[in-house]
Swiss-Prot record:
Record keywords: Ribonucleoprotein, Ribosomal protein
Record gene name: rpsI
Protein name: Small ribosomal subunit protein uS9
Organism: Maridesulfovibrio salexigens (strain ATCC 14822 / DSM 2638 / NCIMB 8403 / VKM B-1763)
Organism taxonomic ancestry: Bacteria, Pseudomonadati, Thermodesulfobacteriota, Desulfovibrionia, Desulfovibrionales
PROSITE patterns: RIBOSOMAL_S9 (PS00360)
Family: Belongs to the universal ribosomal protein uS9 family.
Length: 130
């Protein structure tokens, strides 16, 4: 049995995007909704489309994404990461284009934990000398 899709996982902050690329017409669905509805802001839509535009594959693949965790921006960037990884599985020659644009690098920055004895991760309670 041959698989009819390419699978990749993208991550950003606490968001995880499990991405499947099928041969198709260019429909992108995120959690069962068209990506335009799931990411209503144009900037987030551009983030999702970025790997497809760079590799000139916009309209060649149907993409189904299951996005979990994090916020909307983190999910959009996780989707971009997942699409980029899946495109390499299909055509390894696209790797140099995506690598140059920095779309294959997992952005490891996460929220720093709050420490005890402080109101936040780095902030300190106000110091009173007297």
């Amino acid at each position: 049995m041959s698989k009819d899709f390419n699978y990749a996982t993208g991550r950003r902050k606490n968001a995880v995007a499990r991405t499947r690329l099928y041969e198709g017409t260019g429909a992108i669905t995120v959690n069962g909704k068209p990506y335009e509805d799931y990411f209503p802001r144009k900037t987030l839509q551009m983030i999702v489309q970025q790997p497809l535009k760079l590799t000139k594959t916009l309209g060649k693949f149907d993409i189904k994404v299951n996005a979990d965790g994090g916020g909307v921006a983190g999910q959009a960037q996780a989707v971009r990461h997942g699409i980029s990884r899946a495109l390499i599985e299909i055509d390894p020659e696209l790797r140099s284009i995506l690598k140059r644009a920095g779309l294959l690098t997992r952005d490891a920055r996460k929220k720093e934990r709050k420490k005890y004895g402080q109101p936040g991760a780095r902030a300190k309670f106000q110091y009173s000398k007297r």
